[in-house]
Amino acid sequence: MENNSAILEGLDTQQRAAVSQTEGPVLIVAGAGAGKTRVLTGRIAYILEKGCDPDRILALTFTKKAAAEMKERMAVMVGDKRARKLCMGTFHSVFIRFLREFAESLGYPSSFTIYDTGDSVSAIKSCLKEMNLDDKVYKPKDVLGRISMAKNNLVTPEAYKANAQAVANDTHAKKPEICNIYALYAAKCKQAGVMDFDDILLNMNILLRDNQEALKSISERFSYILVDEYQDTNY
């Protein structure tokens, strides 16, 4: 385990200030290659040095590569044993853990499976066939893209159908059945015990919004939440 002076070594004044501020929010704004991830991992190590249990720290990032790099850095800085106890990974990988724990409250089995893009396209094709819709008009990949956009804006099938502007836009594009395809696709996924990648984010939002028990349980586990590349989030 590094001591505080070793953790701060090689950092400039602003970076040291960010690493050593262990209470309250901290926002790091800098260009590519400026050492943002180094500051984030340094801050985690500094917090651990102050006595925080590693399982009280949640660290999130976007890509598997970035998550692997963060884990490697932490193993070097604090030792492999402590690094393994940190709740650290991509948004999707961490959220999957939480969703499995509370899946039944969302209508899914805890053993739900994850659709990749190919699986989702096949499911959309099945929906189009069931609805007797022309897949040359409703191109499966385009339909999936529209559904993905809705989910990334936290729009459920019910909310989409109730959104007059969205329905009007689809009708203007000569694709008035998008809302119904979305609803059928979502129903089929839930019935099969399946989530796609966008569902992981959407359902995590729904879980924390609507399930106070889950919100309390998850929020009380962590004293610190750190996010790398936060500018890539939707909000």
What do the predicted segments below correspond to?
Residues 1-7:
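Conserved adenine-nucleotide phosphate-binding loops and their immediately adjacent elements
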Residues 9-20, 24-28, 39, 58-59, ...:
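Conserved helicase NTPase motor core
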Residues 30-32:
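The conserved Walker
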Residues 38-53, 69, 73-77:
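Walker A/P-loop NTP-binding motif
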Residues 56-61, 65-145, 155-159:
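Conserved P-loop NTPase-based nucleic-acid remodeling module centered on helicase motor cores
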Residues 94, 143-146, 150, 203-204, ...:
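Short acidic/histidine-centered micro-motifs embedded in hydrophobic/aromatic stretches
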Residues 125-194, 198, 212:
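Basic/charged alpha-beta structural segments of nucleotide/phosphate-handling enzymes
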